[in-house]
Amino acid sequence: MIHMRTGVIGVGHLGRFHAQKYAAISQLAGVFDENAERAAEVAAELRCRAFPSVDALLAEVDAVSIVTPTSTHFAVAEVAMQAGVHCLIEKPFTLDTEEADALIGMAQERHLVLAIGHIKRVHPAIQYLRQAGFGAPRYLEAERLAPFKPRSLDIDVIMDLMIHDLDLTLLLTGAEPVDVRAVGVAAVTDKADMATAWMTLNNGTVANLAASRVVREPARRMRIFWQDRYASVDFLNNTLHIYHRGAGTVPGIPGVRDEAVDLAKRDALAAEIEDFLNAIAAHRPVFCDGVAGRRVLAAALQVRVAVEAFLQR
C-alpha cells in the first residue's frame, strides 16, 4: 500500500480501470465524471466518494489520473497543477505541442510529477529489449489492428492506436523522425480509421507502422531488425522471439537461431500507476514524463499532417 491520496477524473471505460488500480494500491479518495450517475456507480463499487466537481476532488488528493477526452486534457491538468496535484494524463498527452509545452513548464515550475500514459513502455518484451544492449535498430515494422468500438471517436486512429508504436519506435531508437510519409482512410468515422506511416529517423533507422480500428481480427505485433538479429514481439499473446545469426535452430533457415524469451505476465496499468506514485514519493523520474509524451505527440502530429494531405487529394 502506497500512503497517498489519489483520485480519477473521468471514469468511463478506461477511467474505471484506473480507479480500480488506485483503490488496490493507494488511498483512493474518490472520482469525478461529467456523468454523475457513472461516477456514483464507480464510487459505490470501490467504496469511495463521487465528488460533485473537479475542484472538490482536487482539494482532497495528492495525485490524480486524468482520463477524459483529449480535447479536455490541457484544461483539466492546468487546474490540477494549479491546485498542487501530481498528474498522470492518459495518452495522447494534449491536442497540440503548445498545450504540452505549457503543462511541462507548469509541472517544472511547481515541482510536480507529470506522467503520460504510454502504457506499452512497461511491457516485459520492450523492457527486455531495452536492456539487451543490441543498440539502435536499423528497421522496425509494426501493426496494431483492432475491431471497431464506439470509443475514442474524438481522435483518429493515429492518436488512438498508432501512437503506441510511435512511442516504442522513439523509445527503442532514441531518435526523432526527419522524414514522414503516410496514407490513411476514414472508413467508418469522419476521421482516419486506418493509417500506414513510413518514417526515417535522424539516426538512420527506418520505421513502417500500420494501424486500423476497423478490422475483424485484432493484431498487435512489432518486428525490430538489427544488423545480425531481429526480434518479433506479439503483444496480444505476450511472446518475444529473437532470431540470431549463428548456429541454426530454425527449420528451413540455415544459420539462424531462435531464442524464445520467457516473459512474465504483469498488470501493465497497475505497474504504470505504481511507478507514477513511487516517482512522487521518491522524487525520481517517472516512466514516461511530459517531455517524452511531447516527443511522441509531435511525431503523431507529423503523421496526421501527411494523412490529411493524402485524404484531401
Swiss-Prot record:
This is UDP-N-acetylglucosamine 3-dehydrogenase. Keywords: Lipid A biosynthesis, Lipid biosynthesis, Lipid metabolism, NAD, Oxidoreductase. Disulfide bonds: none annotated. It comes from Acidithiobacillus ferrooxidans (strain ATCC 23270 / DSM 14882 / CIP 104768 / NCIMB 8455) (Ferrobacillus ferrooxidans (strain ATCC 23270)). Exists in multiple oligomeric states. Pathway: Bacterial outer membrane biogenesis; LPS lipid A biosynthesis. Belongs to the Gfo/Idh/MocA family. The gene is gnnA. GO terms for cellular component: membrane. Oxidoreductase involved in the synthesis of 2,3-diamino-2,3-dideoxy-D-glucopyranose (GlcN3N), which is a component of lipid A in some species. Catalyzes the NAD(+)-dependent oxidation of the glucosamine 3-position of UDP-N-acetyl-glucosamine (UDP-GlcNAc) to a ketone moiety, forming UDP-2-acetamido-3-dehydro-2-deoxy-alpha-D-glucopyranose (UDP-3-oxo-GlcNAc). Is specific for UDP-GlcNAc, no activity is observed with UDP-glucose (UDP-Glc), UDP-glucoronic acid (UDP-GlcA), UDP-galactose (UDP-Gal) and UDP-N-acetylgalactosamine (UDP-GalNAc). Cannot use FAD(+) and NADP(+). Its EC number is 1.1.1.374. It catalyses: UDP-N-acetyl-alpha-D-glucosamine + NAD(+) = UDP-2-acetamido-3-dehydro-2-deoxy-alpha-D-glucopyranose + NADH + H(+). It comes from the Bacteria. GO terms for biological process: lipid A biosynthetic process. Structural data in combination with molecular dynamics simulation and mutational analysis suggest that Lys-91 or His-164 is likely the catalytic base that deprotonates the 3''-OH group for the oxidation reaction. GO terms for molecular function: nucleotide binding; oxidoreductase activity. The lineage of its organism: Bacteria, Pseudomonadati, Pseudomonadota, Acidithiobacillia, Acidithiobacillales. NAD(+) binds at H13, L14, R38.
